[in-house]
Swiss-Prot record:
Catalytic activity reported: a 2-arylethylamine + acetyl-CoA = an N-acetyl-2-arylethylamine + CoA + H(+)
GO cellular component: cytoplasm; cytosol; perinuclear region of cytoplasm
Residues that bind substrate: 122, 157
Enzyme Commission identifier(s): 2.3.1.87
N-acetyltransferase domain location: 33-194
Name of this protein: Serotonin N-acetyltransferase
Organism per entry: Gallus gallus
Length: 205
């Protein structure tokens, strides 16, 4: 996953569901670059990217195919996909969590009353890595969360070698995570979302 020292300032645009009506665009024409929330129909493409990105590094995926479908059915508004000419090239999947720290249950639960957005996975297609897409997608996702009344903070867990990447995205390490997966241990990180009234007033939310 690439690490960027700075992310270009891109004005966030309203996120929409999949565009199924061909009348909204010219025939055979797809937008060069599009950001939108994901749907269960995107699950297979999501899993293919995730599997390739994580299996070789960690030996397992943060989310399996049935879990991806589960979250994209329950809370698609907490996902974000980056599409190039209709092809998924990077994505984030999140859910709501209602505790101060992550626990094992956070891996599979979505609590609609939660105020913490648990980011389960960020992954970029192998042919689009080393281009800064991971940092840009995370930046756009955090801007989007500021438009959601339910979101107060974003939380995630990652292996130690990814801590510098997420620090550059504005996350702060809060200590070792209680969650373990096999022999893997993680650092828990968070990013405050609340208190950004100025950003809300100027982001079209």
């Amino acid at each position: 996953m690439p690490v960027l020292g700075a992310v270009p300032f891109l004005k966030p645009t309203p996120l929409q569901g999949p565009r199924n009506s061909p009348g909204r665009q010219r025939r055979h024409t797809l937008p060069a670059s599009e950001f939108r929330c994901l749907s269960p129909e995107d699950a297979v493409s999501v899993f293919e990217i995730e599997r390739e990105a994580f299996i070789s590094v960690s030996g397992d995926c943060p989310l399996h195919l049935d879990e991806i479908r589960h979250f994209l059915t329950l809370c698609p508004e907490l996902s974000l996909g980056w599409f190039e000419e209709g092809r998924l090239v990077a994505f984030i999947i999140g859910s709501l969590w209602d505790q101060d720290r992550l626990s094992q249950a956070a891996l599979t639960l979505h609590n609609p009353r939660g105020t913490a957005v648990h980011i389960h996975v960020l992954a970029v297609h192998r042919t689009f890595r080393q281009q800064g897409k991971g940092s840009i997608l995370m930046w756009r996702y955090l801007q989007y969360l500021r438009c959601l009344p339910c979101a107060r903070r974003a939380v995630l867990m990652c292996e130690d070698f990814l801590v510098p990447f997420y620090e550059k995205c504005g996350f702060v390490a809060v200590g070792p995570c209680q969650v373990t997966v096999g022999t893997l241990a993680f650092t828990e990180m968070q990013h405050e979302v609340r208190g950004h009234a100025f950003m809300r007033r100027n982001s079209g939310c």
